[in-house]
Amino acid sequence: MSGFRLIDIVKPILPILPEVELPFEKLPFDDKIVYTIFAGLIYLFAQFPLVGLPKATTPNVNDPIYFLRGVFGCEPRTLLEFGLFPNISSGLILQLLAGLKVIKVNFKIQSDRELFQSLTKVFAIVQYVILTNIFIFAGYFGDDLSVVQIGLINFQLVGAGIFTTLLAEVIDKGFGFSSGAMIINTVVIATNLVADTFGVSQIKVGEDDQTEAQGALINLIQGLRSKHKTFIGGIISAFNRDYLPNLTTTIIVLAIAIIVCYLQSVRVELPIRSTRARGTNNVYPIKLLYTGCLSVLFSYTILFYIHIFAFVLIQLVAKNEPTHIICKIMGHYENANNLLAVPTFPLSLLAPPTSFFKGVTQQPLTFITYSAFILVTGIWFADKWQAISGSSARDVALEFKDQGITLMGRREQNVAKELNKVIPIAAVTGASVLSLITVIGESLGLKGKAAGIVVGIAGGFSLLEVITIEYQQSGGQSALNQVLGVPGAM
């Protein structure tokens, strides 16, 4: 016997597990574009409010994961309450465990690959079920819910989770480009940036039914015309409100986006030559952001698990009573503008401050602990991921050998050794830089938007690279040639 394998536990449920079939033939470039765009649009249009919630004026339990939502496409009190987190986390965690040989799986065998994909899907669905019921019984959706209400909320959130999982699988199975979850997440982050700047949705922010626009620019315009604020007061509010997007955070987010865009072009070019034809020289680029945004995603995945576990203990067990022994040890949640559940010390050590000045004056230690956590986890992940994801120095050296390529001035047997001097350093340095940008942005009070824009920009560039390669290989007959006016298009 080969022993127990974790992937084997999904075998009994394979007949009832929903699955997207592989396409019968390779899809044309234009079809993949359509599938990719519509997958993102369908997810965006799925942000329906939950049905069956008590019509309370003010929720008793506010949002404990407000600073994590922007990274995983989560929308509070909608069908997308937990967004893409279960899908992204299940893929990252299980692939990491498989690469570290914690999970026994042979990716060279098709049946093992299929079982692993099914395990990833089941793990994501189970997370949707667990998260839904944690929030239900913690009182996030209201107190004293009836059995019908509990069942209805479960049906909506778990059903939406299964739908989201299958929607991402459509892209993963070859109907679109790259990773389905990453593509959808990139679309959501881009949309959120527009909504945070120009959103007209009115959100209640006070006890007296006072509302403000979600978009920072729209809020400025309304503030200048408001009867409840002076001209100067409207401008100040537009730049410094800490419970909804403001112009200061919008400017910082755009600055971070520009920096990440620039970092995408930073690379080391290694001179290479062909071993099959003389005089054929070129360069092999190794990007600074070698592992992309995955290091930041991993750090925030671990943060999500930590804060959900803390939420269970503080809210579900201790009922958020400051006098309870659990709250004395872990801290409790404080209400911020009837929207956010802000953790207190010591849980606040692993949560970014809601504003820079509040962080400096009330929780200065957070800058050290939060930054250290993001940096250490990101660097550790990048170092492990580059070694197990098929892009290590040894893997690249094997690709060179298969393609008849070698480093200029180096023997073929020394290629892996030379690449090993560059690739791990690039992966770790890139992860360090992205983590540092993230913690600086979050320390300024961006509430997850810094991490979100880092993930969105890096994910967008990865998608663009995949589309570009696909277009060069099979996009010659694409209808986009005619639209873009490419010379020689039919």
UniProtKB/Swiss-Prot annotation:
Keyword Magnesium among UniProt keywords: no
Principal subcellular localisation of the protein: endoplasmic reticulum
GO molecular function: protein transmembrane transporter activity; ribosome binding; signal sequence binding
Keywords noted in UniProt: Endoplasmic reticulum, Membrane, Protein transport, Translocation, Transmembrane, Transmembrane helix, Transport
Transmembrane intervals: 33-53, 122-142, 147-167, 175-195, 243-263, 294-314, 340-360, 362-382, 422-442, 450-470
Family classification: Belongs to the SecY/SEC61-alpha family.
Further information: Present with 704 molecules/cell in log phase SD medium.
UniProt record, GO biological process: post-translational protein targeting to membrane, translocation; SRP-dependent cotranslational protein targeting to membrane; SRP-dependent cotranslational protein targeting to membrane, translocation
Membrane-side (Cytoplasmic) residue stretches: 1-32, 143-146, 196-242, 315-339, 383-421, 471-490
Gene: SSH1
Task of the protein: Part of the Ssh1 complex, which probably is the major component of a channel-forming translocon complex that may function exclusively in the cotranslational pathway of protein endoplasmic reticulum (ER) import.
Location relative to the cell: Endoplasmic reticulum membrane
Name of protein: Sec sixty-one protein homolog
Residues on Lumenal side: 54-121, 168-174, 264-293, 361, 443-449
Quaternary assembly: Component of the heterotrimeric Ssh1 complex, which is composed of SSH1, SBH2 and SSS1.
